Amino acid sequence: RVPGLEIQALYGYRACNIFSFKGMKEIKRFNPEVIHVQTEFGIGIFGRIAAEYLDIPVVYTYHTMWTDYSHYINPINSETVDTVVKKVITKISKFYGNSCQGLIVPSNKTKDALIHYGLKQKNIYTIPTGLELERFSVKNKNNELCQSLIEKYHLQNHFVLTFLGRIAPEKSITVIIDALKKV
C-alpha cells in the first residue's frame, strides 16, 4: 500500500505521491503480467510509471466522465473556466486512453465519448458496472412487498419517487424534481 492523505471534501478520496521507491520495489518483486490502473491521478500515475519502467502492459478502467465534474474546479461558475477545464479533461482522457494496452469503460456512452475525444484505442472493452438493472424490471416486481410498504408508511394517496445514489450536482436530481412539477 502506498501512503496517502485522505481528502474529506472529495468523499474520502486518498491522494498519494505519484512515486514510491518501496512500491516500485514491491511491484518489481511481484512481477505482474499486467498493471491495472483505475484512476488518472496519484496511484494511477504511479502505476503508469511502474509499467513504463518495468515494461509491463497497462489496462486502464475509465470510471468517471470527468467533464460532468468540471464544476468542482470552477468555484466562480465561469463559462470560460468551464470550457478550458473540459478541454484539459478531454486531452488528459485522450492521453491516458491512448497510452494503455487495454481500456475498460462502464458503458457504450462512455466509449463513444472517449472516441469523440480522439482516442485511437482499438482495445476498448465495455464492462457494465453498478446496478443489475434486470433485478428492477417490472416483471420482478413483488406486489405483496410493495403493498406492505405502502401500508406501513401510509403512502396510499402519495406519489413516491426514489433516488438511489450519491447526492451531487452532476446527478441532476433537481431536473427530475422540476420536471415533476410540470406533470
Residue ranges and their predicted role:
Residues 4-9, 61-91, 134-138:
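Acceptor-binding helix/loop patch of EC 2.4 sugar-transfer enzymes
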Residues 4-35, 39-49, 53, 87, ...:
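An amphipathic, basic-hydrophobic alpha-helix
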Residues 37, 104-105:
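Short beta-strand scaffold positions
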Residues 53, 83-102:
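Membrane-proximal helix-turn-helix segments that form the acceptor-binding/catalytic region
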Residues 109, 130:
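Carbohydrate-associated surface elements
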Residues 137-154:
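A short helix/loop element that forms part of the nucleotide-sugar donor recognition site in Leloir-type
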Residues 144, 154-171, 177-180:
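Conserved donor-binding/catalytic core segment of Leloir-type glycosyltransferases
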